[in-house]
């Protein structure tokens, strides 16, 4: 396993389109739910243990060799918000382009052909991790970090939060990320039916409201 490949995949500069998404943080800021670093930490922790766990498990399952198309259907079933389903597929399409250019793989090619409009991002992330020679825990860690890192970066722009404080939030959440990655990888090894379906209804509702706004900084 290449540790450097893990850093490349988890790097926020990997051109997979994540910079355009706040992971629900913009809607939370607008609703007054995130006002400072403490609020951000609680928001990210809640996101980690719900949608983060689900996404991490889907990514780990792709590395375990489960059918990507079945995983894509499982991701659809676990994403009740139409806006978030659409965003996940658009992010998956962008991730697919970046991954195929970085780590060419027949598995990535096959999924791209089967889902020309994009597969769910966590599934593509898992196949990218597999192509990079990474394991299920690695893919789960990438997904978990992304779950918290996206909102943390967005809130720096949305609130003018000190970047040092945002980074400290991520550091404090490291034990949660490790826990989520371990749980996700363990579930992935048991099969698709064992994958968690944790959800966050408020995030789903906020995503639909956010998508209907005419003026917004982030797509989600």
Q: Model features per residue range: what roles?
A:
Residues 27-32, 47, 51, 62-66, ...:
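Generic structural signal for hydrophobic core residues of well-folded globular domains
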Residues 33, 37-42, 131, 140-220:
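C-terminal auxiliary extensions adjacent to catalytic cores
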Residues 15-23, 35-39, 50-57, 86, ...:
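Conserved active-site and cofactor/substrate-binding residues in soluble primary-metabolism enzymes
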Residues 2, 6-69:
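Glycine/small-residue-rich interface belts in oligomeric ring/scaffold proteins
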Residues 56, 61, 65-134:
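Internal, conserved structured core segments that host functional sites
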């Amino acid at each position: 396993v290449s540790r450097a490949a893990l850093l490349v995949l988890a790097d926020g500069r990997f051109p997979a389109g994540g910079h355009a998404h706040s992971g629900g943080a913009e809607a939370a800021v607008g609703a007054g739910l995130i006002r400072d670093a403490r609020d951000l930490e609680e928001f990210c922790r809640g996101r980690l243990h719900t949608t983060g766990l689900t996404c991490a498990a889907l990514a780990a399952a792709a590395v375990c060799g489960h059918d990507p198309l079945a995983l894509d259907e499982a991701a659809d079933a676990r994403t009740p918000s139409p806006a978030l389903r659409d965003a996940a597929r658009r992010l998956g399409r962008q991730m697919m382009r970046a991954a195929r250019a970085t780590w060419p793989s027949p598995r990535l090619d096959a999924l791209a052909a089967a889902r020309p409009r994009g597969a769910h991002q966590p599934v593509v992330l898992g196949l990218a991790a597999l192509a990079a020679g990474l394991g299920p825990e690695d893919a789960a860690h990438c997904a978990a970090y992304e779950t918290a890192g996206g909102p943390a970066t967005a809130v720096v722009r949305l609130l003018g939060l000190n970047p040092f404080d945002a980074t400290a939030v991520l550091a404090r959440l490291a034990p949660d990320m490790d826990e989520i990655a371990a749980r996700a990888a363990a579930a992935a090894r048991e099969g698709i039916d064992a994958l968690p379906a944790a959800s966050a209804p408020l995030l789903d509702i906020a995503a639909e409201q956010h998508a209907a706004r005419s003026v917004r900084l982030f797509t989600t």
